[in-house]
Structures are given as C-alpha cells and as structure tokens.
Swiss-Prot record:
It comes from Rhodobacter capsulatus. Belongs to the HupH/HyaF family. Disulfide bonds: none annotated. It holds the Pfam family HupH_C. Residues 1-24 are annotated as: Disordered. This is Hydrogenase expression/formation protein HupH. InterPro entries: HupH_C_sf, HupH_Hydgase_express_prot_C.
Length: 275
C-alpha cells in the first residue's frame, strides 16, 4: 500500500537551523562602489589662475574630441605652483592607477574624470586624454622579465600548462587587432605548477594596472606580445576570476566613448563654477 505520508525536505523543521546565539558564517559581500561627486576647488581670485582655467578648457575640448578616437596630451611644466595646484585639485584621483617601467619610469593616475590621466615621471608632468595613456600601449610588452620560447623539463605537478602555452603563443603571433581572445583559468583545471610554468614562459612586461571600484582588478602585461593577465578580486581580496587575454589592451582598463563625453561636460561644469 502506498503511503500518503512524505518526509519533510532536508533543512526544514526543528533542529535543522542554528539555535540561540549560534552565528551563521555568511560570505562577506562587496559593500560599496565609488561614484562621482563633484568637487569644486576654492578659488578666491580667478584671474590669478587664468593659465589653469585655460588648460582645463583645452582638456575638456580634448576629451570631447578624443571620444571620437585618438589621444591628446597637455604639458604642465609651464604652470606656476598656484596654477599647478589647481589642476591637481581639480583632477583628483579616480579608480585606475598604472605603473609603467622603463626610462623614464611613469606613474599614471586616472583623474575623477574618466579618460583624463595624470602622467608623472623624471622630467614628465602632463595630462593625457584618451581611452588609455600612450605609454601603456607602446611599452606594455617591453620585457621586465623575459619570457621563454622552449619548455623546461616539466615537474610532476604540471598538467595543462604546455597546451595553454602553445595556444597562447599561437594566438599572440596571429593577433592583428579586434576582439580579445580570453582563456578563463578559473574554469579550467590547473595546478600551482601550471601557473608557475605559465608565468615563467610568458614573462613579465612593463605595465601593471590596478582598477579599484566594485572590488579590484589587477592587469599585468606579460613579455609575450598582446598577452595580458587579468585578475578580479572581491572586496575581501579573494580572487574570483583569473583570465589571460590576448588583446591590445584589456577592455576593463579603457575609458569608453561615453566616459570621455561625460568627462568633457563635467570639466566644463567645474570651470563654470570657478569662474
């Protein structure tokens, strides 16, 4: 005889849930995301900062033009201390920072206006406007640590790295622009020895990028042309996505056309408020 009685589902009923002061161990989720809020520099006498205001107007026009493609550069060396300070205060610090090795070594900080970059180094003090600073493209794959072309003797823990390396070398040699080829290491079975071998074979390039926001993204150029390591971390610094991209520049580092158009408008709003 078939019984009409059914057991309750697992996880329901007395004793299935924590009681009293027992705590639940929830994973911590991202708690916030940066958003733009206008900062208006305090200027007592706008006539004393005419060069800075003129430059900001030119930067806004440059952002508008670069939204259609290309880059623009504005040298800050000719500004006196007061005008230079106004530029620095207006630019602020955005979510993307870059370290570019080479001569001269460069530190890049995106401003609060997306696509407007402060570039500093020995003898270098300028603002660049565009999807990404020029040196981040031209120097990216200059070897800080050379990659290798021949596999070394393989350790016991190596499983999938040789096949991935062969695929990446082929994609690197064939890449002529366009859409990125992405290998998602998070979804592929691999060992620590695989990662060590990949790092050894690909080498390390000249550009490291950190994008902060809803978690962090670390982008590292390898010494293999067009090959980037792109790693996403949550707000607790746990690695949640690990990829290798074959592309000119990973999209996550680029300011979009809409970003540049928006930046042009916001810089002009600041100018109007100061004047």
């Amino acid at each position: 005889m078939v019984s009409n009685f059914h057991l309750p589902p697992v996880g329901f009923g007395p004793g299935s849930q924590p009681e009293g002061d027992e705590e639940l161990g929830y994973m911590q989720l991202p708690s916030g995301m940066r958003t733009y809020s206008a900062h208006l520099p305090e200027v007592e006498d706008s006539s004393a900062v005419t060069p800075a205001l003129k430059l900001l107007d030119e930067i806004a026009a440059g952002a508008e033009a670069c939204a259609r493609g290309g880059m623009a550069s504005f040298d800050l060396a000719g500004l006196d201390a007061q005008n230079r300070a106004l530029i620095a205060e207006t630019m602020g610090q955005g979510e993307v920072a870059m370290k570019i090795r080479g001569i001269p070594a460069l530190m890049v900080q995106e401003s609060v206006f997306a696509g407007v970059w402060s570039v500093a180094g020995a003898g270098v003090d300028r603002i660049e406007v565009g999807a990404v600073p020029a040196a981040a493209l031209s120097r990216a794959f200059e070897p800080f640590r050379k990659g290798q072309t021949a596999l070394p003797p393989l350790s016991d823990g190596v499983v999938n790295a040789p096949a991935l390396i062969a695929e990446l070398f082929d994609k690197s040699a064939a890449y002529v622009g366009g859409a990125a080829d992405v290998i998602n290491l998070t979804l592929l079975p691999h060992t620590e020895e695989d990662l060590t071998l990949l790092d050894y074979m690909l080498g390390e390039g000249a550009v490291t990028i950190l994008s902060r926001g809803y978690g962090n993204c670390r982008i590292t150029a390898t010494a293999t042309p067009h090959v980037w390591r792109v790693q996403f971390y949550n707000s607790t610094d746990a690695l949640i996505l690990d990829t290798i991209e074959v592309t000119t520049m990973p999209e996550v580092a680029l300011a979009a056309r809409e970003d540049l158009e928006d930046s042009a408008g916001r810089i002009r709003e600041v100018l109007e408020a100061i004047r």
